[in-house]
């Protein structure tokens, strides 16, 4: 990403994604540890080209394709769990079939749902836990995969201290950037560590494969550290 474009995106994002970010003078407590999730051995797959779900993050979705409307209907009659996976580049050649996907995805549970008059759904999917696709079942209107859960244990005391340090580092970098751009930041609050990761990734305007790489990192601390490194590099340009 060119530095001028990066700075412009960051400048716009400082206000556009303020709900997920915090300044050094307005620290917020860390989010409670993620509740352990017991995933089923198989999950329906919802592959998209530009959306990556993360644990402890809520994702609004609109479901309009008939096959995925059937998927949601079946999920609502069962455990309400759907597996989000990212489509690999080149998916367009076989979008209606079984285009290639990244093996690591994130399972989510439907927490809110509304069926519209035309049969479409609007829903909110709350990220539960990462998984790896080991195989797919044949047949059916939508894809179903056998999975291996990839749990992320809650951070220990040392990791929690490191997360706090990275949050402070991010806050300092954002404050410095705001000063450089002549922006007067207001008192922002931090919803959660996972929310900070998502907000910062949005500020940095990551491409889908970069979101995927972020998901595949083993927890909030390495994700936050990776994004803070990128932010620091950009603010030096």
PLM features: residue spans?
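Sec/Tat signal peptide C-region and signal peptidase I cleavage site
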Residues: 17-23
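N-terminal low-complexity, acidic/polar interaction/targeting segments
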Residues: 23-237
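Bacterial N-terminal signal peptides
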Residues: 5-17
């Amino acid at each position: 990403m060119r530095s001028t474009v990066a700075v412009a995106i960051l400048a716009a994002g400082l206000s556009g994604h303020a709900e997920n970010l915090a300044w050094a003078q307005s620290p917020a407590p860390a989010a409670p540890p993620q509740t352990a999730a017991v995933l089923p051995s198989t999950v329906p797959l919802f592959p998209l080209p530009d959306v990556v779900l993360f644990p402890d993050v809520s994702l609004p979705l609109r479901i309009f394709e008939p096959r995925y409307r059937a998927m949601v209907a079946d999920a609502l009659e069962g455990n309400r769990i759907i597996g989000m996976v990212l489509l690999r580049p080149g998916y367009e050649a076989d979008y209606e079939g079984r285009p290639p996907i990244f093996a690591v995805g994130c399972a989510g549970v439907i927490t809110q749902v509304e069926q519209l008059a035309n049969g479409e759904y609007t829903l909110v999917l709350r990220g539960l836990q990462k998984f790896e696709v080991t195989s797919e079942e044949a047949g059916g209107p939508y894809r179903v995969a056998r999975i291996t859960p990839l749990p992320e244990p809650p951070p220990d005391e040392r990791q929690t201290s490191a997360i706090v340090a990275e949050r402070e580092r991010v806050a300092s970098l954002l404050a410095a950037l705001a000063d450089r751009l002549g922006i007067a930041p207001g008192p922002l609050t931090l919803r959660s560590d996972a929310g900070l990761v998502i907000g910062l990734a949005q500020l940095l305007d990551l491409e889908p494969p970069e979101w995927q790489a972020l998901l595949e990192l083993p927890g909030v601390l390495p994700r936050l550290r990776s994004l803070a490194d990128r932010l620091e590099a950009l603010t030096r340009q």
